[in-house]
Every structure is written in C-alpha cells, then in structure tokens.
Amino acid sequence: MSPLASTLNFKHDALVRAFAKKYKLSMASSEELFAHMLQWLWFLANRNLGHQPRHGFPTFPAQAPLDIYWHEFILDTRAYQDFCSTHLGGFLHHCPTPEGLEGASHELFLNNPQQQREINQMLLKKAMYEVHAKMGLETMLSWYLHLHQKHPHLVQT
C-alpha cells in the first residue's frame, strides 16, 4: 500500500484526455477530477485496514463525478489492475452500494419513505464523518459539496 502522496503522483494522461473529451471538460477540470478520483480510491482501499474486512462504502449523487471517472478508469483494465497492485495493495473492486446497507432498501423506500430518508441521512452523516476523519475537511467538502456543484452534468440521478 503506497502513501497518499505517492498515489497522487500516478499519471494516466490518455485517460485524463479521453475523459475531458468525452465529458466536454477542460484539461484542468479533468486533471482535478482525476486527482480526486485517485484520493477516493486510496481512501476506499485504506479504510478499516487491520480492523475488519473491507465492506461497501455508500456513495451519494454528490460523488457521481468520482464514480464516473472510476468507471472510465476500470475500462483500461491493465492500467487499473497495475495501479491497484502498486498503490492500493491489491485490486479494488467496484461494487454498488449494497441493498440493505444499514436497513436501506428499495422496498423500504416504497413502504416507508420517511424511514428510508432517515437511514440515508444517517448513512450520509457517517460517510462524511469518516471522510473528514481520514482525509480532512477540505476533501470532505469537495467530495460532498463542491465537485457536484462544479460539474452538475456529471451528477447521476
């Protein structure tokens, strides 16, 4: 597992250019999102090390720019696998937020939307707290507020 600073030095110029072109971003914006995506992957790979098995981490619409970039990176399977081996201590699988995480489910949404909202708010608070504790206030604000405001066309609904 490499330190965050080393992970942030990873370059994939072809991916940055392709992402900028596909999503009509400036190179500077694509590079900024790429750096945040690297931080996001490092965070996911490093959470709970030595304490419990890795488990899903909830994502919210605000993380859509990071998630979309991750999807694009995964498509370059060799580069992604090499990156994971070198910087994350092994392959980081991409899994959707698990159905039933902390009781959240589509069925609950249909039957008790208020309870579903309360669970989602609790999950969001826990996620933001964990990111703040591990990555700092600036990163937490970027991931949960600024990136999706800056790139609304990348926010999934």
Task: Give residue ranges: language-model regions.
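Intrinsically disordered, low-complexity, repeat-rich regions
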Residues: 1-157
